[in-house]
Structure formats: structure tokens, C-alpha cells
């Protein structure tokens, strides 16, 4: 592990403006943080570089206010430009060891994985945590191969860095997932897609304690 500060991965919010249906982006992130989100990842695959940068600047100001880490998905340049707390990359993004060399030792590096082999490689390459999934069908990532709870447990038991579950996690399945013993859950629609974002986050937070 490279990042020296203690990070609570418990309720890991991942952004998606599409599920907000036109609601204010930063206000929605704030509601999620007030409801208990412990870390925020900005994931905006469709945004232009300028738009992503402007969103990231606003998100950084918000997360700093609440002392919550801000992670940027994929875009190392944006993360460095706004001095985000870290970067999260997938298997088809820049290799983790390259990202680590770019962001240095004092930023958080997360890597998406689906197997123990990928997870071990991520740790060797300098990852601080891994996001394992997709655990359930999800509208935000249609190409993800499902990971079973038994596979998730196997990965967790064989890893020394924090493991975050991702993919289709909601109030109906969150307790079952947390019983595996992982360190947190990454949530998109089950928070940002709800009418009352703060209440949705509070309810999920209560389920992981």
C-alpha cells in the first residue's frame, strides 16, 4: 500500500450524471456525502476534457470541505490537474504501474479486477485497493462479466489490500455482499438514481455497519 492516510472505503460513491436525470451534479454529490458516502469517484466517460476538468474542480472543492477523498476514473491528467486524492483504472485503461509512476506514492490508486490473478497483479503494480465486479447486472456497465460471491470471498481471503465490491449493488443485496467480509461497496444508481439521495445513502450506510 502506497497511500499513507487511512481511507474508509465503506460507502464508495461512483458518479454518473445520466442517472441524475438533470438534477444538479454537485448538489447531488453533496447530498450523498451528507448521507454517509465515505469516498467519491468521478466517472464521466462521455465528458469532454474541459467539462471533466471543470466538474472535477467543483467536486474537489466539495470533497475537501467534507474531508472525503476524491478519486478520478481513468483520467490521470485530470486527477493531477485538480490535485485529486487518487485515480481508479480498469483493465483496459493505462497499466496500474504506469499510473503509479505518474501520480507518485502519495495518491490513492485503485484498480478494477474480476479475478484473483488480476487482483494480485494490481497489488504488485502499486494499487491501494481493488474494485471487484461486476457482482450483479448493472445499467452503468453493460460489458462486465459477473463475479460470484464465492469468487469475491476467495479474492478477499487472498488479498492484503482493501477489496471493494462493485456492480448492481443496492439495498436488496448489500448485506449479503458485506457478509463476505469485504471493505466496502461501490454504488452508483442505488444512491444517485433515487429521488432522495441523502436518505438512500443513509439507508445503505446503515446496512454496512
Swiss-Prot record:
The gene is thiE. It comes from Alkaliphilus oremlandii (strain OhILAs) (Clostridium oremlandii (strain OhILAs)). Transmembrane segments: none annotated. It is an enzyme of class 2 (transferase). GO terms for cellular component: cytoplasm. Gene3D superfamilies: Aldolase class I. Its cofactor is Mg(2+). HAMAP family: TMP_synthase. CDD domains: TMP_TenI (cd00564). The lineage of its organism: Bacteria, Bacillati, Bacillota, Clostridia, Peptostreptococcales. This is Thiamine-phosphate synthase. It catalyses: 2-[(2R,5Z)-2-carboxy-4-methylthiazol-5(2H)-ylidene]ethyl phosphate + 4-amino-2-methyl-5-(diphosphooxymethyl)pyrimidine + 2 H(+) = thiamine phosphate + CO2 + diphosphate; 2-(2-carboxy-4-methylthiazol-5-yl)ethyl phosphate + 4-amino-2-methyl-5-(diphosphooxymethyl)pyrimidine + 2 H(+) = thiamine phosphate + CO2 + diphosphate; 4-methyl-5-(2-phosphooxyethyl)-thiazole + 4-amino-2-methyl-5-(diphosphooxymethyl)pyrimidine + H(+) = thiamine phosphate + diphosphate. 2-[(2R,5Z)-2-carboxy-4-methylthiazol-5(2H)-ylidene]ethyl phosphate binds at residues 138-140, 168, 188-189. 4-amino-2-methyl-5-(diphosphooxymethyl)pyrimidine binds at residues 41-45, 73, 112, 141. NCBIfam families: thiE (TIGR00693). It comes from the Bacteria. Binds 1 Mg(2+) ion per subunit. InterPro entries: Aldolase_TIM, ThiamineP_synth_sf, ThiamineP_synth_TenI, TMP_synthase. Pathway: Cofactor biosynthesis; thiamine diphosphate biosynthesis; thiamine phosphate from 4-amino-2-methyl-5-diphosphomethylpyrimidine and 4-methyl-5-(2-phosphoethyl)-thiazole: step 1/1. Condenses 4-methyl-5-(beta-hydroxyethyl)thiazole monophosphate (THZ-P) and 2-methyl-4-amino-5-hydroxymethyl pyrimidine pyrophosphate (HMP-PP) to form thiamine monophosphate (TMP). GO terms for biological process: thiamine biosynthetic process; thiamine diphosphate biosynthetic process. One of its GO terms (molecular function) is thiamine-phosphate diphosphorylase activity. Its EC number is 2.5.1.3. Keywords: Magnesium, Metal-binding, Thiamine biosynthesis, Transferase. Belongs to the thiamine-phosphate synthase family. Mg(2+) binds at residues 74, 93.
